[in-house]
Amino acid sequence: TKISKHGLGLAIDINTLYNPYVKEKADGSWHIEPATGEPYAFDRDNRTDIPYKIDHNDLAYRLFTEAGFEWGGDWISLKDYQHFEIDL
C-alpha cells in the first residue's frame, strides 16, 4: 500500500468548502468534493463573491509556492483548488 502525500506530511488541503476538488467525468458531468462546494467550483477567476478563495493573488498561494509547493488549482486534467503539495 502506498502512503499518500497527505499521510507523509507533504500535502495539505486548505478550506475545502470554498476551494473544492473539481473533475469532469466521462459522461460530461462534474465530480465535486465536497459536494457542498459546488457553488464555488466554476468561473472562479471572474468572481469576487467567494470568501477565502485561493487563487494566484492569495497569500496562501504565494507563501506555499515560494516554499516550493505545487498548487492543485494549476493542474490541467482536474482542479484541486484546496490542495498544495511538495516533492522532497
Positions of PLM-derived features:
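Catalytic cores and adjacent binding grooves of peptidoglycan-active enzymes
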Residues: 3, 8-88
